[in-house]
Amino acid sequence: MRIDTSRLVLREMTEDDFDALYAILSDAETMKYYPKPYDEAGVHRWINWCRDSYAKNGFGLWAVTLNGEFIGDCGISLQPINGQWLPEIGYHIRKDHWRKGYASEAAAACIRVAFEQFGFPAVYSYMNADNEPSWRTAMKNGMNQVDAYTDDHHGYLRVFAIDRNTWEKQCTDEYAVHAK
C-alpha cells in the first residue's frame, strides 16, 4: 500500500530502509520513552514484523518519506492495550524533523485509512504518560484520553482513541489522503 498526503508518502518498508530506521530506533533521545533503544537485530525484527503485518493484515507501520527521504515510520498495528488487541496508530519521526507536523500528518492519514479502507470502528494510540509530544499528536488528530494503566514493560501509559462517528464529524481535508 502507498499513502500520499500533501507533503509525505507512506509506503511499505523494505530491508533497504534498515540504515535509516536504525538511525531512528537506536537513538536514545528518540526512544526515551521505550524501555531501551533498539540494536541492529531489533531493527531487523521490526522490519520483518512490519512486512509480516502487511502480508497478514494489509496494514502495518509504513515508511514515512519526505521528497523520497526516509524520515520515520507511521501506521496501524494491532497492539495489546490494557489486555485487549486493538488497532493502534503509532509513529516515530527522525528528530531533525520533529515539530514540523509530520507525525500529525502521517497519523491523520493512517487514521483515515484505518476507517475508510479497513473499517475499524475505533483506533487508539498509547504511549508513556510522560511522552507529551506523542499524546499531543494524538489529541491534534481528534483523539481523547480513554484509559490509563501501568504496564510492567512500559510503565504508566495513557490511551487515546477516536471512533469512526466522531472522526467523521470532525474530519477535515487538512491532510488529504490518496491511498493506493
Language model segments and positions:
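A short helix-loop-beta-strand connector motif used in the catalytic cores of GNAT acetyltransferases and
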Residues: C50-A63
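Short, P/G- and charge-enriched loop/turn segments at secondary-structure junctions
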Residues: W49-R51, D147-A148
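Acyl-donor (CoA/ACP) binding surface of acyl/acetyltransferases
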Residues: M1-K32, L61-K180
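Conserved GNAT-fold acetyl-CoA-binding loop/helix
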Residues: E29-W49
